[in-house]
Amino acid sequence: MTTVLLVEDDPAISEPLARAFGREGYEVRAHGTGKGALEEVAGADIIVLDLGLPDIDGLDVARQVRAQGLTTPILMLTARSEDTDLVVGLDAGADDYVTKPFRLAELLARVRAQVRRASGEAIED
Protein backbone atom coordinates (compact mmCIF):
# COMPACT_ATOMS: atom_id res chain seq x y z
CA MET A 1 0.00 0.00 0.00
CA THR A 2 1.24 3.49 -0.87
CA THR A 3 1.99 5.63 2.17
CA VAL A 4 1.35 9.38 2.23
CA LEU A 5 3.16 11.37 4.90
CA LEU A 6 0.85 14.36 5.42
CA VAL A 7 2.53 17.26 7.22
CA GLU A 8 -0.03 19.97 7.97
CA ASP A 9 -0.61 21.77 11.26
CA ASP A 10 -4.16 22.95 10.54
CA PRO A 11 -6.67 20.20 11.46
CA ALA A 12 -9.30 21.88 9.24
CA ILE A 13 -7.06 20.94 6.31
CA SER A 14 -5.25 17.82 7.52
CA GLU A 15 -8.29 15.85 8.69
CA PRO A 16 -10.32 16.10 5.46
CA LEU A 17 -7.17 15.51 3.41
CA ALA A 18 -6.32 12.41 5.43
CA ARG A 19 -9.85 11.09 4.81
CA ALA A 20 -9.59 11.84 1.09
CA PHE A 21 -6.23 10.07 0.82
CA GLY A 22 -7.70 7.12 2.71
CA ARG A 23 -10.63 6.91 0.28
CA GLU A 24 -8.07 6.84 -2.55
CA GLY A 25 -6.53 3.74 -0.96
CA TYR A 26 -3.46 5.36 0.59
CA GLU A 27 -2.14 4.66 4.05
CA VAL A 28 -1.88 8.06 5.73
CA ARG A 29 0.54 9.14 8.44
CA ALA A 30 -0.31 12.67 9.53
CA HIS A 31 1.87 15.06 11.51
CA GLY A 32 1.37 18.66 12.55
CA THR A 33 5.06 19.39 13.04
CA GLY A 34 8.20 19.18 10.96
CA LYS A 35 10.09 17.30 13.68
CA GLY A 36 7.37 14.64 13.83
CA ALA A 37 7.46 14.31 10.06
CA LEU A 38 11.24 13.93 9.96
CA GLU A 39 10.97 11.04 12.43
CA GLU A 40 8.56 9.23 10.07
CA VAL A 41 9.95 10.12 6.65
CA ALA A 42 11.45 6.66 6.13
CA GLY A 43 8.91 4.44 4.47
CA ALA A 44 6.79 7.24 3.02
CA ASP A 45 6.06 7.00 -0.69
CA ILE A 46 5.19 10.69 -0.96
CA ILE A 47 5.31 13.67 1.40
CA VAL A 48 2.57 16.30 1.25
CA LEU A 49 4.20 19.16 3.13
CA ASP A 50 2.84 22.47 4.37
CA LEU A 51 5.37 25.31 4.48
CA GLY A 52 4.05 27.07 7.57
CA LEU A 53 4.68 24.63 10.40
CA PRO A 54 4.94 25.63 14.07
CA ASP A 55 8.42 24.25 14.73
CA ILE A 56 10.47 23.71 11.57
CA ASP A 57 9.63 25.55 8.35
CA GLY A 58 8.49 23.19 5.59
CA LEU A 59 11.39 24.36 3.44
CA ASP A 60 13.82 23.16 6.11
CA VAL A 61 11.99 19.84 6.33
CA ALA A 62 12.37 19.40 2.56
CA ARG A 63 16.06 20.32 2.73
CA GLN A 64 16.66 17.83 5.55
CA VAL A 65 14.86 15.07 3.64
CA ARG A 66 17.07 15.73 0.61
CA ALA A 67 20.20 15.97 2.81
CA GLN A 68 19.45 12.42 3.97
CA GLY A 69 19.72 11.34 0.34
CA LEU A 70 16.04 10.46 0.10
CA THR A 71 14.31 10.85 -3.25
CA THR A 72 10.78 10.57 -1.87
CA PRO A 73 8.53 12.92 -3.85
CA ILE A 74 7.63 16.08 -1.95
CA LEU A 75 4.50 18.03 -2.81
CA MET A 76 4.46 21.41 -1.08
CA LEU A 77 1.06 22.63 0.02
CA THR A 78 0.96 26.28 0.99
CA ALA A 79 -0.91 29.57 0.95
CA ARG A 80 2.22 31.27 -0.40
CA SER A 81 1.58 31.89 -4.08
CA GLU A 82 4.29 34.29 -5.24
CA ASP A 83 6.60 33.10 -8.01
CA THR A 84 9.59 33.46 -5.69
CA ASP A 85 7.90 31.15 -3.15
CA LEU A 86 7.43 28.52 -5.85
CA VAL A 87 11.06 28.77 -6.93
CA VAL A 88 12.36 28.60 -3.36
CA GLY A 89 10.15 25.57 -2.66
CA LEU A 90 11.36 23.71 -5.73
CA ASP A 91 14.97 24.64 -4.98
CA ALA A 92 14.54 23.30 -1.43
CA GLY A 93 13.70 19.89 -2.87
CA ALA A 94 10.00 19.92 -3.68
CA ASP A 95 8.84 18.01 -6.75
CA ASP A 96 5.55 19.87 -7.02
CA TYR A 97 3.87 22.89 -5.46
CA VAL A 98 0.14 23.43 -4.81
CA THR A 99 -1.29 26.63 -3.39
CA LYS A 100 -4.18 26.93 -0.95
CA PRO A 101 -7.02 27.05 -1.54
CA PHE A 102 -6.71 24.03 -3.80
CA ARG A 103 -9.06 21.78 -5.73
CA LEU A 104 -9.07 18.35 -4.12
CA ALA A 105 -9.31 16.50 -7.44
CA GLU A 106 -6.23 18.32 -8.74
CA LEU A 107 -4.25 17.65 -5.56
CA LEU A 108 -5.11 13.94 -5.69
CA ALA A 109 -4.13 13.79 -9.37
CA ARG A 110 -0.79 15.43 -8.61
CA VAL A 111 -0.15 12.93 -5.81
CA ARG A 112 -0.97 10.03 -8.14
CA ALA A 113 1.38 11.45 -10.79
CA GLN A 114 4.26 11.85 -8.33
CA VAL A 115 3.77 8.33 -6.97
CA ARG A 116 3.72 6.93 -10.53
CA ARG A 117 6.93 8.77 -11.42
CA ALA A 118 8.66 7.63 -8.26
CA SER A 119 7.74 4.01 -8.86
CA GLY A 120 8.93 4.13 -12.46
CA GLU A 121 5.47 3.55 -13.92
CA ALA A 122 5.15 6.91 -15.68
CA ILE A 123 4.05 6.60 -19.28
CA GLU A 124 6.64 8.00 -21.64
CA ASP A 125 5.56 10.20 -24.54
Q: Where in the sequence are the language-model features?
A:
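N-terminal/domain-start alpha-helical segments
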Residues: 1-119
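Short, intrinsically disordered, charge-balanced linker/junction segments flanking boundaries
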Residues: 119-125
